[in-house]
Amino acid sequence: MSSNVEKETYSFYDTYTVDSDIDIKLPRTKIQFKKLDNGFAYFREDSEQNTIEKSIPSMKSIQVTIAPVLPINLPAKKTNGLIFLRLDKQILVTPESNVEISIKVPIEIGIFIKSELSADMLDVITCEPMHSRFGLYGVPDGGNLCMYSKVSQIYDKYPEPYVWAKMRITIKNELKQGVKIGKFVFPITAHKVYYKQKSTEVHIDDLTARVYSDISGENMELMKTVFETAGEDWQVSDAGTDSSASFVMDKGFD
């Protein structure tokens, strides 16, 4: 689907036909396309006054897609696809029980130039600079480098648009005692990103977290669960690149 660009806000997730100057309005981010004689100029300034400029040769118009993508590109791809989500409040799970929660998950925004054959990423943006951080799970000399974000549970409405997506987590405690859970580490690149066109709703594939005990102690295995779209009009914008869909947290999860 595409829509002609007029004097509206051009920031809903969608594909736009651009044939003149436009502004794209995202939180803490300024984006402009300028029509030139031989194509288009692209300009972006973020909340920290970092700027980028690019040129797009074209005769008359371009197709611009705005879509959420996995939070793995900024500040650089150095984590082997792992993400470390630290809960602002620990969750207590009683013995031998299951609970389901919904949490915020950070996203980035991709700006794509679409053609009949492909959709090429022109730029990728984070509307919250605090998401562009690294964290270490485990010990300094042998731990896992991860993208890091502090997150909270979602109780009713969708979280801040363009900054967060929604994810459901089913926690299964197989132990005979209660456990406190304060963090989740898993390969985000195994997940897909889903969004609704002309909207700001975003969902990421869900998780199942299994707490169990073996000879090494208490562990938590996190496994991807495919988001059930229930026939709704969800689009897939980022299908991930990693076939590994699970991770065992054997260095603590409280």
Give the location of each predicted region.
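Interface-prone segments of viral and bacterial extracellular assemblies
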Residues: 1-254
